[in-house]
Amino acid sequence: MSKIAILTDSSCDIPQEMAEKYGIDIMSFHILLDDVDYIERESCTNTEFYDKMRAAKGVPSTAAITPIQFCEKYCQYVDEGYTDVIHVPINKSGSSTYNNALMAQGMLREERPEHHLKIHLLDPHTYSMVFGWYLCEMARKLKNGAEISHVIHEFETQMDCMEIVLGPYSLKQMKKSGRISAAAAVMGELMGIRPIITLIDGKTRVEAKVRGDDKVVPAMVELCKQRSEGVENFDYMIGHTNIPQTTDLEKACRKAFGKPPLLVFELGGVVSANTGPDTVALVYTGHPRG
């Protein structure tokens, strides 16, 4: 009889109660900010981390989970009698974590040469609850008797059409991290320019620029409507950093799409370290990219 584990990392942004409900195993990233090492999901709450970023002098940096850490986790599964582990780490193009997991498989063969654990390593090509939600769906279906090959195929098919629109209300973090120039950030702040950014297949792109905070939510919703027009089984989620505009985005989405979001969730430390602590995100079903 199969005994299956689902393993991911803290970039998934799965709320703790959902992780416990579906038995999702989450390994935490370390985030360094102003010489202080924070363990995501352990050292502080998301809200506390947003406040620390706003007050920080420097830029947060994240450390990839190491091959040794992954090997130890795989060994644990072997020792506990698991037959399979579905391992979905952070987007491969944005971190060395995926490659570290590959290295750990070789280390496992040395540590447990007689092991029979099947490791299904998947690249979600994205971040946050864009894949976190569907890991929970995967766990639910496995519990109801679905085959591993079936849930993996469904997951990969779903990831092929998921998109994110980001609305940052401050350019401070992007300036610090070098994602935009200091001059562009200063001019943007002075003129109230806000970029509307898509995150698709792990790549960011500025799709539009609006002037004034009140234009951000309408632009995000309009872009989502354009990119998802004609999509069957459309759904959406809202990510946030506990800012007032979260409510504005949810109201606008309910009106535009005629349905509530699957989930309203907090952006975790790894994600907000890149987007900044004053950001809302609209996650939605787009067209398959093939």
Each model region followed by its residue ranges:
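N-terminal glycine-rich phosphate/adenylate-binding segment common to multiple enzyme folds
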Residues: 69-108
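N-terminal glycine-rich anion-binding loop in soluble enzyme alpha/beta folds
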Residues: 5-71
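Mixed-charge interfacial surface used for oligomerization/domain docking
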Residues: 3, 11-25, 30, 36, ...
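Glycine/charged-rich beta-loop-alpha catalytic/anionic-binding loops adjacent to active sites
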Residues: 55, 83-87, 111-122, 264
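Short coil/turn segments at secondary-structure boundaries
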Residues: 58-65, 89-96, 125-126
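Short glycine-aspartate micro-motif
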Residues: 5-7, 85-87, 267
